[in-house]
């Protein structure tokens, strides 16, 4: 039987072919649509709780944040386990995050407020959880619009990466949205915030590690050059 270490080594050496990549993305597509199918089934069977509007809004909002966390988890997964084939799923998960965020927003506009623009403006200004939620959605828009390979080439790799670092800000805004919105007695918002903090912490530690390694390499190269000159 394979040990956990040998299974990890196998995953690290695994090269995803084009066929396997398409199969993997197809599976992710299906999994990302499952929450929507479940929601449609519950709506069709009249099982949306005593407050259907609140249930719809919360369901779509929670899945938006879960998909955002899944997107943010791809790089930490590579850092921790040395596995990188899952990075190819980042664009797909990011677009599904935006898709669910738009559905969440649409329910708020169409069902909750029914195009009452004056009331929506008042809510955005007065209710801080709506304020940060709207800001998070606004920041998601440029990331979704620039997710194509053509936009990466047009913006340039460096500028594109700088723009897409907004996802970290979006994650923190989403966490605040849930923390400020949650009712007393609920704990899931703290779990989401803790997961986000852990994922961002792994990224920060990895960035520090890479900076220190580059400094050591530069110092080693400088010492080698000094020794050669002195000899």
Where are these regions (language model features)?
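Membrane-embedded alpha-helical bundles that constitute the cytochrome b-like, heme-associated redox core
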Residues: 2-231
């Amino acid at each position: 039987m394979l040990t956990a270490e040998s299974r990890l080594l196998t995953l690290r050496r695994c090269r995803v072919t084009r066929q396997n990549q398409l199969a993997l993305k197809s599976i992710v597509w299906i999994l990302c649509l499952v929450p929507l199918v479940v929601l449609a089934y519950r709506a069709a069977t009249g099982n949306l709780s005593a407050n259907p509007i609140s249930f719809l809004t919360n369901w779509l909002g929670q899945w938006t944040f879960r998909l955002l966390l899944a997107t943010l988890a791809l790089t930490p997964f590579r850092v921790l386990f040395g596995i990188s084939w899952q990075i190819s799923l980042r664009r797909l998960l990011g677009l599904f995050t935006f898709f669910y965020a738009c559905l969440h927003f649409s329910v708020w506009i169409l069902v909750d407020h029914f195009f009452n623009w004056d009331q929506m403006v008042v809510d955005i200004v007065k209710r801080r959880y709506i304020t940060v939620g709207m800001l998070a959605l606004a920041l998601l828009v440029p990331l979704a619009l620039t997710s194509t390979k053509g936009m990466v080439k047009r913006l340039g790799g460096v500028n594109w990466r700088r723009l897409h670092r907004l996802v970290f800000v979006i994650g923190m805004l989403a966490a605040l949205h849930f923390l400020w919105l949650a009712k007393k007695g609920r704990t899931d918002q703290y779990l989401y915030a803790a997961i986000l903090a852990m994922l961002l912490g792994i990224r920060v530690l990895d960035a520090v590690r890479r900076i220190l390694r580059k400094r050591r390499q530069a110092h080693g190269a400088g010492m080698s050059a000094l020794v050669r000159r002195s000899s």
